Amino acid sequence: MTQYTPMIQQYLKVKADYQDAFLFFRLGDFYEMFFEDAVKAAHELEITLTSRDGGSSERIPMCGVPYHAAKNYIEQLVEKGYKVAVCEQVEDPKTAKGVVRREVVQLITPGTMMEGRTIDEKENNFLAALTHFEDGSYALACNDLTTGQNTVTLLTGSVEDILLEVYATGSKEIVVDSSFSKDELNKLTETLKMTISYEDATAIPEGLEHLVKNVSQAKLIKAVGRLFNYVIRTQKRSLDHLQPVEIYYTNQFMKIDVHSKRNLELTETLRTKEKTGSLLWLLDKTKTAMGGRMLKQWMERPLIQKERIEERLEMVETFVNDYFLREDLKEKLKEVYDLERLAGKVAFGNVNARDLLQLRRSLLQVPAILEAISLLDNAYASRLIQGADPCESLTELLGRSIQENPPLSIKDGDIIKDGYNDKLDQYRYVSKNGKTWIAELEKRERDITGIKSLKIGYNRIFGYYIEVTKANLAALPEGRYERKQTLANAERFITDELKEKETLILEAEEKIVQLEYDLFTALREEVKVFIPKLQHLAKVISELDVLQSFATVSEEEQFVKPVLTTKREIFIKDGRHPVVEKVLNGKLYVPNDCIMPENMDVFLITGPNMSGKSTYMRQLALVTVMSQIGCFVPATEAVLPVFDQIFTRIGAADDLISGQSTFMVEMLEAKNAIANASERSLILFDEIGRGTSTYDGMALAQAIIEHIHDQIGAKTLFSTHYHELTVLEESLDQLKNVHVSAIEENGKVVFLHKIQDGAADKSYGIHVAQLAELPDSLIARAKEVLAQLEGQEEIIIPKRVEVKVQEAAPEPVVVKEEIAEIQETKVETEEESQLSFFGGEQSSKKQDKPLLDQKETAVLAQIKKIDLLDMTPLEAMNELYRLQKKLKKG
């Protein structure tokens, strides 16, 4: 390092502590980067890469950005997942001896950004900290530095389960200890696309102990300690806005895994990953940024406590029934800025005068809001606003201190109102009225002394002076005038008052700017005292905003208040999919009932593709979620139980689990439901088994249905294209067949989108292919083959069988084959006739000659005697393996 100049040595010394970050090194009016940082930053920021002499034989790569534009460049890097260490000059270069002292004043990371385009006003910007314990459990702590919110929870389960909970927080950065395994880190970076940071300290930092008073578990404290230590180490400034840590447990809320949230499009759509088109988009009628954030949090964690849900519903009903109250509240909420993030900026020291003006304007609305809510005859409303302080003294302070239209910078002056500070008023008066004041002083001195020729003048060397001719010197009072200069015919004097005013006049502008800055920083410290009250007020305002949002959308979309029941029954009359209905924009939406009494657990849904099976299933889930966050629901009548979990398998394979086939994802999600669902859960399975061969898929689908029916008892909607499964209604007493109806008109299918009792009688798959505009020749051939398969033609479909058997294997093997139609020589009896794919009996056709030998006929007879509905999938495969071996022995 000694080969480099002292400044480059200083750079390298600082950089050694921030190897994983870009180092913005302040040099005069620029932030410079050197070596690898410069090469990489020039590429990422698309700025010029140059070089400079650093003392070594080779020139050093260098790039830089102006300090006044650095914020934009820092945001670009952080948006891409990088960290930026800001290194400032911490002493005046004019007085520095040697190299100017520099220090890193802040490490800016994806999880610690306070403002900028990466921060969505209606979303939290969480930083997560994950701590792993020897017993296999984890503690997850989260902090939103912009709002001061802190949460912590204890997690158990597989690493995948833990990662999914981390993902659910929406964190952009996660802090772990240095002992985390490479495999775990790979999952965090590759699967969750999060920035990784390290912190080994877990003790609660000094001065923050009061934030964990309600946390007693050592594991939780360690996670919070890791989080706080990282924040302190990186931010290096006041954290007065941090709120007490909130403990939550996943079993306190309805559990909806990440796959299900995506499938249901709760907060973003599957295709675009955007809010528009999601349930959140529909329900968000909030007027404040903090209300928008709370709405999303409620949607991420629906309630499971019946009493709490009903409290919200009653409050929403109050707003629905009082239009004028609701509209007045909305008008006032429009004027309320983001109190949480304003409080955070105050604590961080980066609040400006416009921010404080926004704070005052917000507080002006609060008394009327609280008064209106206090008049409601509602216990929940009374409890909600209890302890809410409108901070009227702060409103008054800001009202008399901050100008109505202050500049953005706090170092340009013109921030503080006249009358707030006497000294500032004097400076301003002097600055604006210096000459007038001098003329007034001159007149006053003439009156005091009686010397009419007395005058006040100014020159660059002596400044301001009072000049008296020598003939009038005797008229001057003794002791008041100090001689400053002697001329041939006159003497020049100075008085204490003139000396003071001279200083004021000459330095007024400079002193005005500095004094305003000092007054503003002092004011900022006074505002800090109100941070806890502001944060409490923000929560009250946020909750009222979400509740009025529910009321507004409920009235606009004609939703109905759901009735919660302790019974395991669902009664939804004329239910609708809220988002689909909204997107249709006035076009006819076909509502559907969903009526499942206590003794009915499973709906087996059949019907054509594109007929609305998936929409119907999602509809029930969304109605459930809306009910349990406290919103009215899209129906004319709704009676619902409180569900503890929702499990779904709807739609295409989820890309969160990379490298897995559709079928494997299906099985993993089915396993999740089977392993974790209770009789209080809701299960939605759409076309389970389609990712494998027909018989495999059918066998697995049947086994899953039977297991849910017999072992779990959860309310379940199970759609299938295996029409053979509809016979399960005969053996499973709590299963009911329903179908989505369709009709044919002039050879074309018309989907009615109506759920009706019973099984479907036709698939209409070819009609769907026609809608997709497949070639006419292909459609015609498909109709030919379908006719042959349904036995409507005498042409035999050529048998295509691929059998792979490991003869030495002692256990049964899975045989994958195409369906081969087996024709018999005799006319089949009614009992022997084969069922077609969707219900009708296969017509038997007498063949000209037999296709089976004696042994094959015997095996076929045994197959016909087998009762598949009385066998498990494993037993069925064993029997198939036995018969297969019998055939091959010939």
Curated annotation (Swiss-Prot):
One of its GO terms (biological process) is mismatch repair. InterPro entries: DNA_mismatch_repair_MutS, DNA_mismatch_repair_MutS-lik_N, DNA_mismatch_repair_MutS/MSH, DNA_mismatch_repair_MutS_C, DNA_mismatch_repair_MutS_clamp, DNA_mismatch_repair_MutS_core, DNA_mismatch_repair_MutS_N, DNA_mismatch_repair_MutS_sf. Pfam families: MutS_I, MutS_II, MutS_III, MutS_IV, MutS_V. Keywords: ATP-binding, DNA damage, DNA repair, DNA-binding, Nucleotide-binding. Belongs to the DNA mismatch repair MutS family. NCBIfam families: mutS1, PRK05399.1. This protein is involved in the repair of mismatches in DNA. It is possible that it carries out the mismatch recognition step. This protein has a weak ATPase activity. This is DNA mismatch repair protein MutS. The gene is mutS.
